[in-house]
């Protein structure tokens, strides 16, 4: 019994010495030497495509198809610095205005805007019917269009939106009689979309241009079509957030 009591005393004294020293067993300075260093990601590049004045986009019945991401080779922020680019985000801020010819009638139409990926560009910009083949009898109803079965391996719809425009038979220069007023209609509309998570990769040829003919693989188009034949013009900005990747 006395021996066992002495053993407990020694173990208690050892524990007190360990606690008073403040050193944790099994920990070394090497554990802290490999602490992670936070790295900041480089900012995305930005290209702004403006439609205003003489560069406004005219959208006739049947629609239009334009290239997004026309990155020419260069050193500016809006240029591609390598032969590969990746579009991550797109911000659309457009104002649609019905033409005077369309305003002469009283009508309502549902138009459509698409973002379309082209996996295998042919060197020439595609037409709307190349992507969405349809009979002429469905030209006024773009919400019924589908990607052609023969080209579904090439064209992929990334985003699709609809919008409504109205005209009431009056143009902007008309003046109502003093005894009446004309109710407003949606012949001028604001179209805003912010798209994330696109990840559209484009491989460019060994050229300096930024057109469809300079693309080897992967292109992004915007397709706009009016509903019920209500032609309009597009004013505003498309902003693309992208990166130049790969080798110089």
Curated annotation (Swiss-Prot):
Chief site of localization: virion
Subcellular location: Virion; Host nucleus
GO molecular function, one term: structural molecule activity
GO biological process terms on file: symbiont entry into host cell; viral penetration into host nucleus
Motif (Bipartite nuclear localization signal): 1-28
Keywords: Capsid protein, DNA-binding, Host nucleus, T=1 icosahedral capsid protein, Viral penetration into host nucleus, Virion, Virus entry into host cell
Record region (Disordered): 1-42
GO cellular component: host cell; host cell nucleus; T=1 icosahedral viral capsid
Leader sequence segment: none
One Pfam family this sequence matches: Gemini_coat
Domain of life (superkingdom): Viruses
Functional summary from the UniProt entry: Encapsidates the viral genome into characteristic twinned ('geminate') particles. Binds the genomic viral ssDNA and shuttles it into and out of the cell nucleus. Plays a role in protection of the genome from degradation, virus acquisition and transmission by insect vectors, infectivity, and systemic movement. The CP of monopartite geminiviruses is absolutely essential for virus movement.
Subunit structure: Homomultimer. Interacts with the movement protein. Binds to single-stranded and double-stranded viral DNA.
Annotated family: Belongs to the geminiviridae capsid protein family.
The protein, known as: Capsid protein
């Amino acid at each position: 019994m006395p021996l066992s009591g002495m053993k407990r005393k020694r173990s208690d004294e050892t524990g007190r010495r360990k606690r008073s020293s403040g050193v944790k067993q099994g920990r070394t300075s090497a554990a802290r030497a490999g602490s992670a260093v936070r790295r900041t990601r480089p900012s995305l590049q930005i290209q702004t495509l403006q439609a205003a004045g003489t560069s406004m986009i005219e959208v006739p019945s049947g629609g239009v198809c334009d290239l997004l991401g026309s990155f020419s080779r260069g050193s500016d922020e809006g240029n591609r610095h390598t032969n590969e680019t990746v579009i991550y985000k797109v911000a659309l801020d457009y104002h649609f205005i019905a033409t005077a010819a369309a305003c002469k009638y009283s009508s309502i139409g549902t138009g459509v805007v698409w973002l379309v990926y082209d996996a295998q560009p042919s060197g020439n910009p595609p037409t709307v019917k190349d992507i969405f083949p349809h009979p002429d009898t469905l030209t006024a109803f773009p919400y019924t269009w589908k990607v052609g079965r023969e080209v579904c391996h090439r064209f992929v719809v990334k985003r699709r939106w609809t919008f409504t425009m109205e005209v009431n038979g009056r143009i902007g220069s008309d003046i109502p009689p003093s005894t009446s007023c004309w109710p407003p209609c949606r012949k001028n509309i604001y179209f805003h979309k912010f798209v994330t998570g696109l990840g559209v990769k484009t491989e460019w040829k060994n050229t300096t241009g930024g057109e469809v003919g300079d693309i080897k693989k992967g292109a992004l188009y915007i397709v706009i079509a009016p509903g019920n034949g209500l032609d309009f013009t597009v004013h505003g900005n498309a902003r693309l957030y992208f990166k130049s990747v790969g080798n110089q």
